[in-house]
Amino acid sequence: KIAARTHILSDLLTQAKEAVLINGGARLTMSLDKRKGIPSTGIYHKKGQAGNLPSGEAYIAPVEGSAEGEIIIDGSFAGIGTLQAPLKLVFAQGVMVDAVGPDGDELLSLLGDEPLARNLAELGIGTNDKARVTGVVLEDEKVYGTAHIALGSNDTFGGQVAAGIHLDGVMMAPELYLDDRLVLQDGELQI
């Protein structure tokens, strides 16, 4: 069940030219044109295959320089854990230019002065109905009906940025559109 929905979403990500992510009244757009969605199913049958567990996400590296707008992260963030309050991230030309909220300064400190660390590196969708929000992003990002973005590196999964850092931020029940097709709303996949 997890693998099947993960593959469907991965295919939709691959086919899409644009993604629109909406949460808490904020809207973020990004190009996915010619990028390949990746299914993280947790099923590894071939020698050399790898992943992290628990698994259950479909993800993609958005086109560098394409992210525009704002998004509200209201779950957890790698390096911080469960957020004290929602965190608003502002993007221009593919790069996070501001982080507003009680944990904003901590996030900016984690990213440091390296400009590539602020690259919008990933868009992902959680597909694991057994995963739970714990404050540990490796599980939180897999929770069914969530979405996440990441900042920093994406060169290991189809992107072009090697920043030496990769931090994911989880949204609990956003809306996600792929080329005007609604695929996620109110914590439920629309596939």
Label every model-predicted segment.
Residues 10-13, 19-22, 62-63, 113-115, ...:
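A general structural signal for short secondary-structure junctions and capping/turn motifs
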Residues 18-21, 87-90, 97-99, 173-182:
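Short polybasic amphipathic segments
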Residues 75-136, 141-142:
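Internal helical hairpin/lid segments
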Residues 33, 101-102, 152, 188:
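Surface loops and adjacent helix of pleckstrin homology
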